[in-house]
Amino acid sequence: GVGAYNVAMFHLFTHAFFKALLFLGSGSVIHAFKDEQDINNMGGVWKKLPYTYALMIIGTLALTGFPFLSGFYSKDAIIEFAYLKGNTTGYYAAGIGIFTAFLTSIYSWRLIFKTFHGEYNNKEVKIEETHESPLVMLIPLVILSIGAIFAGFVFKDLFIGHGGDNYFWAESIKFLEPLSKEHPPTWFLLLTPCLVLISIPIAYYLFVKNKKLPEEIANMNRPLYKFLINKWYFDEFYDVTIIKPSKKLGLFFWKFCDG
């Protein structure tokens, strides 16, 4: 609802680099663990997979909007334009964006800490058997990491800079109203990066130093925990309201209409 379509496309563009980096990096980890995909069955292998570890750190930093990496330029731009709408909807969108950026950073570092730090938890694969991936798997990660680091800075002006609307987007995007050329206050610009930085020690404490705490918090409110862990039961709702009726409708047409 912000109307900043060029900013959204910019984030989609930068997002491609660091999200692909994390997906392929996850594949490298899965390869090292002989197809194990549960991060609860990993841990303590950052020295065994130094290149994969470093590259996934880059992807995580970019995803969370760490200052001066690609996600920092695009994600913060969306939040800034929401704030600059100057109305209740804009402030609400900016607040939700900041809060979700904070949560995103926590769960992203959860991935890193549970996968590479703490105790080794795999009973099927010995830690001596884990190994770094070959170059054929690492080179694509290196290429993507370059984009995850520099794509935001290099392409910022092209996507959302002054004049970019004229020579890059041209007539492909029609704005209902011009985007604000102002800048948010300094405190607002610093808020998201500060929360991103704060989330790192929080995630380390929760998922390395005091791993029982998340379980204790979940046990304090089991109904809410079950609701969230089951994704608001959206899959079940979708199955009941869309999938099953569609199957029955298809069966009806097959049996009684198609002959």
Regions found by a protein language model. Give the residues of each.
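Hard-cation-handling environments
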Residues: T130-I200
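Alpha-helical transmembrane segments of multi-pass inner-membrane proteins
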Residues: N6, F10, T14, Y92-I96, ...
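Interfacial and helix-entry/exit segments of alpha-helical transmembrane bundles
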Residues: F33-L69, Y91-T100, V125-F150, Y225-K226
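Aromatic-capped, Gly/Pro-kinked transmembrane alpha-helices
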Residues: F159-L191, Y205-G259
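Divalent metal-coordination and catalytic microenvironments
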Residues: H15, M42, G71, I112, ...
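Alpha-helical transmembrane segments and their membrane-interface junctions
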Residues: L61-A77, S145-G164, I242
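Hydrophobic, small-residue-rich alpha-helical packing segments that form membrane-like cores
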Residues: G1-L84
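Predominantly late transmembrane helices and immediately cytosolic-facing juxtamembrane segments
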Residues: K19, F23, Y91-E129, C194-M220
